């Protein structure tokens, strides 16, 4: 009886929220409804985009934006080390990838956008789940995947320029493979910050012997599994289920772990506009979608190392 009562109460609560949400739109209070949905989307996007875990985004004010000398394309000029090479992540609508070798480099802004979600307003009122959560789930996956895909493709382009030094090829997932990758960064005078890999590859750490990770860690893996672990050899690990973005799933040639220097050595992540929900109404039909204007710059191409493992 208690369980049934709880379920019924939750459903009524969700329907009440949805009715209020829809009425705000139909009563002309669209900005309020957009603000509610935007808060959900931004919170979830921070959790879903691994690019945002590696480089923390910074919101730019209007007066911090720089003008391009040839176009109306917004950009941000950033100082960099004179002996380093820099580039930026080319999002939709931004300039083509450029390699900068001077004292400064430009970060150009593009656009990420979700698919459009269209529904009759009366049907929305019958939903048994919070419509704001449904909208955020639909929007966030699209936008986070766009950020992560463009970020990873840029890192791979950097590695491709210096395969002999910025790619470590390993026969199996073991401490020696990562040691060589760590040493490659350190030998270039770059500190070690974070490791990115898929959760599938991360589970290989369960086979690491106690002689590699220590008895306490091996025991913890046995009792709690790898999900309880946030680091390997003291290095924070960002793990993701996005195998199609991180690994070469097309040619099935590699599974990869990316080693990055800390953010102040690696690059910048600017936002002209963070993820924002837009709502459009035409009679009884409501259309929802989200968009953002990010710009990611890699200020030092030496600050990343890719460790490749055989496909499995």
Annotated model-derived regions:
Residues 67, 115-117, 307:
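Generic detection of short hydrophobic beta-strand segments and adjacent strand-loop junctions
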Residues 1-18, 104-121, 203, 207-233:
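Short, structured interface segments that constitute the first stable element of a domain
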Residues 157-231:
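Extended, solvent-exposed, turn-rich assembly/linker loops in the middle of proteins
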